[in-house]
Amino acid sequence: EYKSKMSESEFLRWLIMLQGYFGISDKVKFDEEYKASIGWQYGLGGIFVTGQNLFETLMFNFKIIVSSVGENVPIQNPCWENSGKENINKSFSGLEDNLAGLYTNWSRAILVNSKDIDFSEDLTIKVVKLPLLAPTMIQIEPMTLWKYVKEGENKNHFIPKKHEQGQALWKSFGIITIPSGIEGEHKEPGVIEWLERIQIYNDNKFIRINAVALQYDSNPKSRMPINEMIDDLALHEIVLFEKGKEGWVM
């Protein structure tokens, strides 16, 4: 009887997930021609670092350094600080310059009539596709692998690199940590840069890097999730951070 019902908290978590991993099987768009978003998190080769306790894990992944954009330092601007109309208009720029905005970015405009919400009954929501974030412009994302594109519409830019099904994380070691002197066509994940910066304060010299991502189907008209990919890589900090000529990273 209740397999299709949600509590209020479940519904809110579902809405958050929906914005990050939507696919493109829905049909409704605004009048303008644009590529619809599948959800920003959906396109990432997600990585994060775990410590020996919750505090370490939070500190290892909490990159508090904000990079300037030109001469300006971006102000953190999550979606709830804007009206619905402002968020929709903002989505058509294809850009986000701050992590709070990126992590609360809308892939869909969703209307739920608050007067009609009754979690004992079926809910009706109205959904409209919003434009894709430009992957070449969102390099503030700290929790993804990156690849340098040499041809096509993203030529000469870095874009997030998704994990490959059946491929162990250790095979991506060469793009998790980048040797000194070859940074031009290689981009290190932001959480690894941050971890190296704070490692002098960390007594735990063993590091566990985790990979997580959703795989979508091969149909370009749906992009429905079909599989979750999870892996991890445990290693000593020396292996990760010795990047000079005599170091481990080469």
Regions inferred by a protein language model and the residue ranges of each:
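Cys/His-coordinated zinc-binding microdomains
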Residues: E8-F11
